[in-house]
């Protein structure tokens, strides 16, 4: 009887949840966002070095 009640309650919780509230979806979106952030930081770091070199040239002139 406990198993049946637990199954029914959990089924209702799953069915009443909004489609956008998926826990796995949030994890996947977070991982993608984190990967893009890290990639952007790496790419911006290379641009930062180039900008520093240009700034040194501008000051020297």
Curated annotation (Swiss-Prot):
InterPro entries the UniProt entry points to: Antimicrobial12
Intracellular or extracellular location(s): Secreted
CC annotations in GO: extracellular region
Chief localization: secreted
Keywords: Antibiotic, Antimicrobial, Secreted, Signal
Annotated Pfam families: Antimicrobial12
Propeptide segments, given as residue ranges: 48-61
Protein name as it appears in the record: Pleurocidin-like peptide WF3
Gene source species: Pseudopleuronectes americanus
Organismal lineage: Eukaryota, Metazoa, Chordata, Craniata, Vertebrata
């Amino acid at each position: 009887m406990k198993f049946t009640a637990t199954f029914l309650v959990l089924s209702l919780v799953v069915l009443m949840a909004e489609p956008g509230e998926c826990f796995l979806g949030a994890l996947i979106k977070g991982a993608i966002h984190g990967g893009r952030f890290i990639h952007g930081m790496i790419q911006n770091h290379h641009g930062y070095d180039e900008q520093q070199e240009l700034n040194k040239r501008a000051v020297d002139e």
